[in-house]
Amino acid sequence: MRRITRIWLYIFAGIFVETSMLAQNPFTYYKGKGYKDIAAYRMEKEIDLNTYTPSVPILYEQSVPEHQSTLSYRIALPPYIRGIFFSRDSRPNDYQWPNNTNRLLPWMFHRLKELTQESYPGIPSNSQPSTLGDALLLQLSNGEYLFAKAVAGDNSLSWFQVNTDGTLTLYISTLGEDKLAGQIPLLLIQRSQSVYDAFNNAYSSLIADPKVSSLKRRIDKEYFETFDYLGWCTWEHYHYDIDETKILNDINAIEASGIPVRYVLIDDGHIANKDRQLTSFTPDKKRFPHGWKRIMNRKRDHKIKWIGLWYSLSGYWLGISANNDFPEEIQQTLHSYNGSLLPGRSTDKIEAFYHYYICTMKEHGFDFLKIDNQAFTLPLYMGDIQVVRQAKDCNLALEHQTYNSGMGLMNCMAQNVVNTDHTQYSAVTRVSIDYKKYDENMAKSHLFQSYTNTLLLGQTVWPDHDMFHSSDTICGSLMARSKAISGGPVYLSDSPNEFVAANIRPLIDESGKIFRPSAPAIPTPESILTNPLLSGKDYRIFAPTGDEAISIICYNLNTSPADKTVKSYIKQEDYFNGKKIENSSLYSSAPDGIIAFDWEKQTAEVLNADKEIKLEGFTDRLFHLCPIRQGWAVIGIQEKFLSPATVQILSRTNDMLILNAHCTGTLKVWVESNGRQELRSIPIKRTGKIEIKK
């Protein structure tokens, strides 16, 4: 009898396990699971990008088959020369798409099929490309550029899959139990003769359609005041190993350093959690026995004025623990799914949770938040009902609540479509994998990712190039210049006792305010569709700076010893291409000439023919292209990386130039008069208005 009972138990247990596995939705997310060739209803009609219609930049499916959660379409591509596929990297047994974290990477190809082959070299410091991705840029055989991007609907998400035969499939799904219904947005498409216009026009169309985004252009957003100043972050110095005493000691060391750090960002390591799930918005009591009070008491208007805190969008890395100390009314805004508590299911409940979340941080005294792990919020909901809508509501609630409370927001690990297309108010997002001290190949890859991803993300936010060490002996100075020209936040992560002033002071004025470009730096046209770590060529980026200049950095990012020396160049065309970065009336009239100012050598020359430069090893060269008008070319304060951003041109005539100097130092001005040319150096001992005569 016992044996029969045991057999029945085994059979019953087997039925239970099998039933549980069958009951699990195919989109339920877990580490190591991939979604390649996911089961989908194949639509008969293909999406033909050869018949692109400019008046319809966002394609919608008007006739969704009944009772279907996932559809797939064959995409017919026009003839192309080369392209970029934007997807995360793929590691066995690791998290996969759509948890893109900070890893939406630009994978270069001549044929899409290359991305599926083991021989594909990829980007150093990363694994092979994921064949599931969010965007595609093609240089077409007819000279045009085509940009295609996945979109999120009310409760649907699309994505691309590169197939082993080199074809492209588009998927669209609810990512859960719900069925697709109504008009479903499929993808965004733009074509243009200009690669910059392809991106600009695409995002204009995206922003204009509230069914697929909740966005504003970067230029229409308010940049949070704190991020205009130099900061310091705990992460790369301590990683998780932080506590109250260490942070207070570091604040003392920062103030003693003489470097005007104006904000401190307390990164991960403070969160009360159980098994990487949030248990309280009060910090770990062992590490922070007095809460945040003693640290907040250190804020001073003319020293460290602002303090920010790291948190995860979904609570902590794996969500919210059932063993939490939230008030009963907040407990009611959460529901249990797949081993975690999640905000929802209704929009009102999600808003209520994030109101409590953000107001609690505000009450603690924090001025801004770095909200990380955003791309993992969607996977936490996957396989359930209203997956995309709930994940999107989390992003929107974060935007609403930080905006309403007057708190700044830095978005991090926020590179899936739901995240990127719903930054309604926030103006800063991380654009690359973490920077690592003393890691040359990682630094090269970091720069490549940051600038290329800015082509997309820079349409709606300022790019955060991550923190850096001024004391990095491999690339501290080079990284400082990249942070300057990025236009995003600049924050250190050295031990304050190791600050290298020579790599910091050229970034800022005496108060710690950063000299920033007018728009984020992006690759020059010839650098967009190449992998500079493998090309054997130079890599160039540029940004508009000051009232009328274009600043350019030329890099050698090659990893092969055979390409230790490469040639680069500066030419007049670079200045005129600058107006394609940001539509501006500043470039409406042609200059009389262009001055190329070599920041390293502190020399200037009229740029007539192309200027050739030799780049030895992992290095960079910074130039400012300044227009000559009425015999004047304004370069700016020579000691600062972005010299043109240090002055404002108030007026000029053939005889006089009037400027407003934003900092002290040596002002460089090019002067032409009576057939003579002069690079004039003028000491500036106080800020304000200055008149210069020829």
Placement of each model-derived feature along the sequence:
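Bacterial Sec-dependent N-terminal signal peptides
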Residues: 1-25
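Carbohydrate-binding surface patches
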Residues: 483-486, 491, 530-592, 622-629, ...
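C-terminal beta-strand-rich structural cap/linker in extracellular carbohydrate-active enzymes
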Residues: 607-647, 667, 676-694
